[in-house]
Design a protein with these regions (language model features):
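Predominantly cytoplasmic-facing regulatory/coupling regions of multi-pass membrane proteins
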Residues: 1-87, 135, 142-233, 258-306
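Transmembrane helix-loop junction
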Residues: 71-72, 94, 111-112, 210-211, ...
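Transmembrane alpha-helix interface/packing and boundary motifs in multi-pass membrane proteins
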Residues: 89-98, 226-241, 245
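Interfacial segments of multi-pass membrane proteins
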Residues: 109-118, 246-262
Length: 306
């Protein structure tokens, strides 16, 4: 029993956190349901298409970021394949978060195409770190705007477990970037694509909030969403479900001063666009899932793996 608990503790805690966050979200939706529906009607149809365009650009920018890292690491992959793998990873992250992560799908897909496992794995780790760096650049804006309402002790305590071994974390980071530290230009270009993705995301939020009659600074939106993103990295929920929406609604209500209905409406719309924009990945996913299943069969085999 203790072995089973140790193996599944993180998943169970995340499931419990997700369930709790979703319950709180449902209660909020029930309480503000009519107000939220009225708020949704204020969104302009043309802006729904503009946001769809921005999300399309955002997804392509994310694919370009990883493609640059792969190419500079010596992986001769065509952009079309990088794009397909990226969409497969996004779909798996959004729709299969408890079973197969998006990074696993990307890695297995790249290996299935015949590319080097070590380089692909390192490029995925570097891709994640560059994405985190991008959000980390604008997160201080969110902290500055919300400084008065943040419970600093609680905030710090929440992040301490991840920072208990900073030396080990630094070594892993340097090891991950060892290939690309000799090619700083590739890292910079990847970061530029991260900023393109972020501008599209923040622009989408800005459009929705403006439609709802609230005029908020673009940089305030950038800071508050980046802070929301960092909060969702705390492993208390699967893929940030519920937590992302509640955190953004809380920050928008208490920092910007908009109604909870506006905050939850915008958060729900952004989540919906994240889900919808990953749907192209379902076209390529079955072959990758089959490859993953075969790998699990081989790994479970009693024969030694060389």
């Amino acid at each position: 029993m203790s072995c089973w608990w140790s193996r599944n503790r993180q998943l169970i805690l995340q499931l419990a956190g997700t369930l709790l966050a979703v319950i709180l979200l449902v209660l909020l939706l029930e309480e503000k349901g009519h107000e939220i529906l009225a708020t949704l009607r204020e969104i302009k149809v043309i802006d729904l298409f503009w946001v769809a365009l921005l999300f399309s650009i955002s997804r392509i920018a994310v694919a370009c970021r990883w493609h640059i890292l792969l190419h500079s690491g010596g992986v001769n992959i065509r952009f079309k394949k990088s794009l397909a793998l990226t969409f497969m990873g996004l779909f798996a992250t959004n729709f299969l978060p408890t079973t197969i992560g998006g990074d696993v799908v990307r890695l297995v897909g790249a290996m299935q195409m015949g590319f080097d496992r070590a380089i692909c794995l390192a490029s995925i780790a570097a891709d994640r770190l560059i994405g985190l760096l991008g959000m980390g650049i604008t997160a201080p804006l969110g902290i500055a705007y919300s400084w008065d309402i943040l419970q600093i002790n609680l905030f710090a305590t929440s992040f301490l477990p991840g920072l208990q071994k900073p030396v080990a974390f630094f070594r892993r980071t340097v090891s991950t970037f060892s290939i690309w530290l000799r090619k700083p230009g590739s890292l910079l270009i990847s970061l530029v694509f991260t900023w393109i993705h972020m501008l599209c995301l923040f622009g989408s939020i800005y459009i929705f909030i403006d439609d709802l009659g609230s005029h908020v600074s673009f940089w305030m939106i950038a800071g508050l969403w980046s802070l929301t993103y960092l909060i969702t990295l705390i492993p208390i929920s699967i893929n940030g479900y519920g937590v992302q929406e509640l955190a953004f609604t809380f920050l928008m209500s208490n920092v910007v001063g908009v109604t909870p209905a506006i905050g939850i409406t915008v958060a729900a719309l952004i989540r919906a666009y994240f889900l919808l924009s990953s749907l192209p990945g379902v076209i390529f996913l079955p072959s990758i899932l089959s490859a993953i299943a075969k790998q699990k069969t081989v790994i479970s085999s009693p024969e030694p793996l060389l």
